[in-house]
């Protein structure tokens, strides 16, 4: 959520910056609502003051032995008017809040202006794509040939966009998650967390999935002791970031760096017909998530560091990649600045996203009321939140199968993963 004061005082600037994201803010309507809010606020305060003043005169009139029926009637009339104005004011505030909750974050000035992914800007590459002297297979053919990827059984059990993994490929998938967690906790300073895969509405509102992106989620029917429905997490960003919702942490505790390896669930409502084969776009997938909670002045440096942590995974695995900065029209709803890391996939002969690292600044923190106590004045201030994939496990598995394939259909295991595979050097 944007700063309400900035929104009121810099409405034209806000509209201009949001327009670079493709979000058209109805300035005239919002201005009208703000004027109505001010008018109702003044009217409410005046009615309240009048009623209070007249109410005090009742006791004085009684002490003088005067009839107070007329005064009582006047107080009752003012009370009815006050209640009516409060209802009007609440309706206006609710509409203003709904508009505010629908607004995406303001893009950072360093984010390139553009309409879509074609205007993202590549900032660096690492590694050289391998040259093959045999016909390249994609991960589907490789995985099925090794009896490790079973799409048919997944369709029978559940439906499309799910997978059953078996044997050494299932083991390799597990090894990847463990390797990523170990790297981030032992070398990058993150604390591992085990979090729920089901979250409540308040959590999804806090990180910005609701109210706008409800159709992208899987929802349960009310089934808890509290009688509320829950939603499967689309990313561990949701539970990890919400750990500080409605909290004030000490400045000395910052930065807070958290990581979790979880299953993630997405309906892919807007992706009909895209990546219908294989592991690239699944309803259920594993991901190691990185979250940082920092002071505002540290968040841009933290974004660079977090992106580097995700890149290190690919470097240790020897997987070529490129990093791009997203233009304003391609950024996620809550992001102020985002780097996408794209890994090289020989089976598709292109780079594909494997991590998205974002600085949300105070956008999520304001929705969650996640704050820290500033030592200098002992007052609470909003945190800045950051998140990124470190990495998407399934897509990393795809990259390993395709980049490390051999002519006979076997797959060489990257050296960094061999300790997690019992010393195994090859699958198949």
UniProtKB/Swiss-Prot annotation:
Signal sequence range: none
Keyword Secreted in record: no
Gene Ontology annotations of biological process type: selenocysteine biosynthetic process; seryl-tRNA aminoacylation
Binding locations of L-serine: 235-237, 289, 389
Class of enzymatic activity (EC top level): ligase
InterPro entries attached to this UniProt entry: aa-tRNA-synt_IIb, aa-tRNA-synth_II, aa-tRNA-synth_II/BPL/LPL, Ser-tRNA-ligase_type_1, Ser-tRNA-synth_1_N, SerRS_1_N_sf, SerRS_core, tRNA-bd_arm
Cellular component terms per the entry's GO annotation: cytoplasm
Keywords: Aminoacyl-tRNA synthetase, ATP-binding, Cytoplasm, Ligase, Nucleotide-binding, Protein biosynthesis
This protein's pathway: Aminoacyl-tRNA biosynthesis; selenocysteinyl-tRNA(Sec) biosynthesis; L-seryl-tRNA(Sec) from L-serine and tRNA(Sec): step 1/1
Catalytic reaction(s) noted: tRNA(Ser) + L-serine + ATP = L-seryl-tRNA(Ser) + AMP + diphosphate + H(+); tRNA(Sec) + L-serine + ATP = L-seryl-tRNA(Sec) + AMP + diphosphate + H(+)
EC number in record: 6.1.1.11
PROSITE patterns reported in the protein's UniProt record: AA_TRNA_LIGASE_II (PS50862)
Main subcellular location: cytoplasm
Keyword Cytoplasm: yes
Domain statement: Consists of two distinct domains, a catalytic core and a N-terminal extension that is involved in tRNA binding.
Quaternary assembly: Homodimer. The tRNA molecule binds across the dimer.
PANTHER family named in the record: SERINE--TRNA LIGASE (PTHR43697:SF1), SERYL-TRNA SYNTHETASE (PTHR43697)
Role, per record: Catalyzes the attachment of serine to tRNA(Ser). Is also able to aminoacylate tRNA(Sec) with serine, to form the misacylated tRNA L-seryl-tRNA(Sec), which will be further converted into selenocysteinyl-tRNA(Sec).
Family as reported in the entry's similarity comment: Belongs to the class-II aminoacyl-tRNA synthetase family. Type-1 seryl-tRNA synthetase subfamily.
Protein name in UniProt: Serine--tRNA ligase
Upper lineage: Bacteria, Pseudomonadati, Pseudomonadota, Gammaproteobacteria, Alteromonadales
Gene name, Swiss-Prot/TrEMBL: serS
């Amino acid at each position: 959520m944007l700063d309400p004061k900035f929104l009121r005082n810099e409405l034209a600037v806000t509209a201009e910056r949001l327009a670079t994201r493709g979000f058209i803010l109805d300035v005239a309507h919002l201005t009208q609502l703000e004027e109505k809010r001010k008018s109702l606020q003044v009217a409410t305060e005046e009615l309240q003051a009048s009623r209070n003043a007249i109410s005090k005169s009742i006791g004085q009139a009684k002490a003088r032995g005067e009839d107070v029926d007329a005064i009582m009637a006047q107080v009752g009339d003012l009370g009815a008017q006050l209640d009516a104005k409060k209802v009007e004011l609440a309706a206006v505030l609710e509409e203003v809040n709904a508009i505010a909750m629908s607004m995406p974050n303001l893009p950072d000035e360093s984010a390139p202006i553009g309409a879509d992914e074609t205007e993202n800007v590549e900032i660096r590459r690492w590694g050289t794509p391998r040259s093959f002297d045999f016909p390249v297979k994609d991960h589907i053919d490789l995985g099925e040939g090794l009896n490790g990827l079973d799409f048919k059984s997944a369709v029978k059990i559940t439906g499309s966009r799910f997978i059953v993994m078996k044997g050494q490929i299932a083991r390799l998938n597990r090894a990847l998650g463990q390797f990523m967690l170990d790297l981030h906790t032992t070398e990058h300073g993150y604390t591992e967390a085990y979090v729920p895969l089901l979250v409540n509405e308040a959590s999804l509102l806090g990180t910005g999935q609701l109210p706008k992106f409800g159709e992208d989620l899987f929802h349960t029917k009310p089934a808890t002791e509290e009688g509320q429905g829950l939603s499967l997490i689309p990313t561990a960003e949701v539970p990890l970031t919400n750990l500080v919702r409605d909290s004030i942490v000490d400045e000395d505790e910052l930065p807070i760096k958290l990581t979790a390896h979880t299953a993630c669930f997405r309906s892919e409502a807007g992706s009909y017909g895209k990546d219908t084969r294989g592991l690239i776009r699944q309803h259920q997938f594993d991901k190691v998530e990185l979250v940082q909670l920092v002071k505002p002045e540290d968040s841009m440096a933290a974004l660079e560091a977090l992106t580097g942590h995700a890149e290190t995974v690919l470097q240790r695995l020897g997987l070529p990649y490129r990093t791009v900065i997203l233009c304003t029209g391609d950024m996620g709803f809550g992001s102020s600045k985002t780097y996408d890391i794209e890994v090289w996939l020989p089976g598709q002969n292109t780079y594909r996203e494997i991590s998205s690292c974002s600085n949300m600044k105070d956008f999520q923190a304001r929705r969650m009321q996640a704050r820290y106590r500033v030592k200098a004045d002992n007052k609470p201030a909003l945190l800045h939140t950051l998140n990124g994939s470190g990495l998407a496990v399934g897509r990393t598995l795809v990259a390993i199968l395709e980049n490390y394939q051999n002519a006979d259909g076997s797959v060489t295991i990257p050296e960094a993963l061999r300790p997690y595979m019992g010393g195994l050097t090859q699958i198949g």
